[in-house]
Amino acid sequence: MFFSFLSIYRKIDKDLFKEMEMIKAVLFDFGGVIAEEGFREGLMAVAKKKNLDEQSFFKTAEDIIYKTGYVIGKAKEKIFWEALSKETGVKDDYRRLRLEILRRFVLRTEMLSLAGKLRDAGMVVAILSDQTNWLDEINSKKPFYDRFDYVFNSYVLGKSKRDSSAFRDVAKIIGIKPHLILFVDDNSHHIKRASEAGLKTIHFTGIEDFKPQLEAVGIKIN
């Protein structure tokens, strides 16, 4: 009888510990996860029209958006476009160029649905994105903020995912320990920094692989 009771106690104790260690929040990247990667695809489309090397043009723009501080709200959008024009020689009206980016941030309905199911299951769901004022513009045209408990935009947060402390800051804001948070991103460098900050991670490669990846970290959704 004693050993039987002890076995039951140990099972309950293990189940309780397992429940305590379950993921309680999921942070999603925006471009490349919740939506198509409009920044990269838009810039590459611009480069193609200008007969420029697409990858090189995108990499230059990516470097500039961080160097100018635009992505963390330290510079206005016009500064970014002026710097890009100076570096690449592209002289078009930036208002036309930005549309090439914005129209390519197409929301992925299946990913929004999955986020909703996680939320219905009691998890905190949030966006953590290196974005700019563009994110609010996208939301104003096709609202999606209401699908999430939090939207962390580097432009507002004042830190990008290139700064590993951003992950710890977000964990404090939502009140959940890093090891109980799952971070989903298509950028391997961001994934590495999030992992080093103590978060569980999924390197997103496509919707087809995402459900099995969730199950691998203990999350099952119908």
Language model: regions and residue ranges:
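Hydrophobic alpha-helical signal peptides and transmembrane signal-/tail-anchor segments
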Residues: M1-I8
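Short, flexible loop segments at the rims of nucleotide/cofactor-binding pockets, characterized by
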Residues: I101-V106, S129-D130, K159-S160
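Structured helix-beta-strand junction loops
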Residues: A121-G122, R147
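A structural signal for isolated positions on well-ordered beta-strands in alpha/beta enzyme cores
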Residues: V124-A126, L182
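Asp-based, Mg2+/Mn2+-dependent phosphohydrolase catalytic module
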Residues: Y9, L16, M20-I23, F28, ...
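Short glycine/serine/threonine/alanine-rich loop segments
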Residues: L52, V90, M123, I176, ...
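N-terminal helical cap/lid subdomain that shapes the substrate entry/recognition surface
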Residues: E21-S113, D120
